[in-house]
Amino acid sequence: VIRRTSSLRARLVRFAGAAAALAAFAGAFAPAAHAQQTAICYNCPPEWADWASELKAIQDKTGIHVPSDNKNSGQAIAQLIAEQKSPVADVVYLGVSSAFQAKDKGVIQPYKPAHWDDIPAGLKDPQGYWFAIHSGTLGFFVNKDALEGKPVPRSWADLLKPEYKGMVGYLDPSSAFVGYAGAVAVNQALGGSFDNFKPALDWFAKLKANQPIVPKQTAYARVLSGEIPILLDYDFDAYRAKYKDHANVEFVIPAEGTISVPYVMSLVKGAPHEANGKKVLDFVLSDEGQKIWANAYLRPVRANAMTKEAAAKFLPASDYARAKPVDFAKMADKQQAFGEQYLKVMH
């Protein structure tokens, strides 16, 4: 009996010791797990608009880790719709017309972040479903070294010249917002409207003969490598290439005109890390968050974040006068129909 009792006691002591060790082991890992706060963003590509610096600053200042994500606006919305019953993302970054679609599809929810009142009325949804964080002007991002001695194109008409065969790229306008923005820009510049996309469709049909390159996602690196010598893209990508990557590039605002468009963010409906998502949205509108956009050559929605040093690197105001505003609600309304028409013309 005594032996059995002492044996039982020994087993209990060993069990207690193991339990204590297990608790200590778990305890050692608990702070690390707790410290690793996360928020999931759809369409936050590190190569686009210097999201790499913004995501790093978010982690440094808030402790929230936001993984980068290479979806475009259309792909992000498709994923949000597919995951509607069990959302994965917390926040989403979209071209403005895509934000109208996201609201219509019920995949985003209202949130009015810090500095809400600093955002101009036309650059936010009145209920808070989306709000602009910065804007860009569409034009030609040109790698001059890849032009093989040809002149830098200055107009939409120039891009149709046979000498630029195989040199012109644009993102797919049936999927990527920047692609659709390019289509709207050429359409408006050539006399079209949201009720008449014939000028743009005719232009794309003519461009087809020049064998354009049509990626679905951000193509910054492909311009720098010379694979795509001329890309329909925003000013901020060209300025980044010129001033940060020291590439021999030029940004051109076409002679016939172009458009400037905002990019926006939203809180995802049913966000699994909603509190963290809100902190991310607060940060991108903070003084520091907005300054990162300005230093990446975007126009921050809070204009006072634009430094004199950054502003001096933009083309003159006389060039930007050719960039016209458009009705973003109409732009959103016509996006799907244009995408379908475009696919018919190009395939």
What kind of region is each of these model predictions?
Residues 40, 44-67, 140, 241:
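Short, polar/charged alpha-helical segment
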Residues 44-52, 75, 88-227:
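Extracytoplasmic ligand-binding site segments that recognize negatively charged/polar headgroups
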Residues 50, 118-121, 136, 166-175, 201-206, 212-213, 283-307, ...:
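Periplasmic-binding protein-like
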Residues 97-103, 224, 229-248:
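A ligand-binding cleft/hinge motif common to bilobed small-molecule-binding domains
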Residues 108-117, 130-131, 157-160, 229-230, ...:
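Short beta-strand->loop
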Residues 139-146, 184-189, 261-274, 284, ...:
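A bilobed periplasmic-binding-protein/Venus flytrap-type ligand-binding module shared by bacterial periplasmic
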Residues 290-347:
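C-terminal capping/gating helix-and-loop segments adjacent to ligand/active sites or protein-protein/ligand interfaces
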